[in-house]
Design a protein with these regions (language model features):
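Ubiquitin-like/PB1-type beta-grasp interaction modules and other compact soluble beta-rich domains
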Residues: 1-63
Length: 64
């Protein structure tokens, strides 16, 4: 699969939530697009990933 343009192996049955935690992201502070579709946060724990998926993860940061 690709995450933000970088190739990455994905374990069988991996979810969006598991991947975000593995990458060190706070699921409450990111937006995730899978194959061109925004995934609602409420679905992160159920949304399964495959080797063919393309993910874009956008992190929100505070500041002024």
């Amino acid at each position: 699969m690709k995450v933000n343009g970088n190739e990455r192996a994905v374990p069988v049955e991996e979810t969006v939530l598991a991947l975000l935690k593995e990458l060190g992201h706070d699921p409450q502070r990111v937006a995730v697009e899978k194959n061109g579709t925004i995934i609602p946060r409420a679905q992160f724990a159920e949304e399964k990933l495959t080797d063919a998926d393309h993910l874009e993860v956008v992190c929100f940061v505070g500041g002024g």
